[in-house]
Amino acid sequence: MIRRQLINFQNRSVDVRVGLGAFDELSRMFASAVGKPKRAMVVWNDATSERFGEVVERALVDAGFAVSQLSLEVSPAGATLADADAIFGALSANGVTCDDLVIAVGDAATCSVVSWCANQWCGRTECALLPTTFDAMLTVATTMKPLVASSVNALPAIAFRPEPGLVVCDLGLVREADPEDLKLGYVVLVGTMLSSSKSRWNQFTETVPEILAGEEVALVNAVQWSQTARKD
C-alpha cells in the first residue's frame, strides 16, 4: 500500500508518497515530477549511494532522465554553507536548469540543504526528496533542518519552509532499522502530536503499539499526521 498525500501551501503543494516498497514505484513518480524528463542530479553520500544507487538510477533512466551525481558527506547535525556551495557548483557543472529535477537521498540534513539549493537555483528547480531515516520522513516535506555557518560555528544560518515537489517515504527502511536509530523519529513524532489537536493526540496514543511494532497502516498514518501537524 502506497498512500498519497498532498500538502497544500499558499502557492504550491507537496506530493508525499508513503508506504512499504515505495521506492519500487520511483520511475513512475519521477516521470510525473517535471513536465518533460531531461536531466536529473542526485545528491547522496557514499553509503546511501552504495545502498540505493542502482534502484534510484534505474528509476531515473527508465523515466527518461540523463543522470548525474554528487557524493556529499553532510553532517547529521546540519549541512553547512560549504555543502550548499558544493551543490551549487555541481548544478552548474552538470548544466541543470529550472526544467530539470534535483533529487536528495539521505537524512534530514541532506534533504534540507538539497531542497534549499534547488529552490534557489534558476529561480526554482523541481526537487524530489527520498528520506532514509524515520525522523526525516516525518519532517522534510514541511520543515527544513537549518543550515549552519560552518562545522566550527554551528549557529543556524539559513532556514525556510522547504518546497519539494515530491517526497517518497519507503517504510521498509523503518521496519529494518536498528531500534536505536528510530529514537529521534519517535521523539519528533511525540513532540509533533503533542502540539496537534486533542482528537489527533488520542488517535495517536491508541496506535502507539502498532507503530512500535512496525505495522504498515499505523506507520503511514503517523507520517501523514506528522506532516499535516507540522504544516499548521
Residue ranges and their predicted role:
Residues 36, 64, 208-218:
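Short, glycine- and charge-enriched coil/turn segments that flank and shape catalytic ligand pockets
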Residues 1-101, 191:
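ATP/NTP phosphate-donor binding region
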Residues 52-54, 113-115, 139-140:
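Short glycine-/acidic-enriched loop or helix-start segments at secondary-structure transitions
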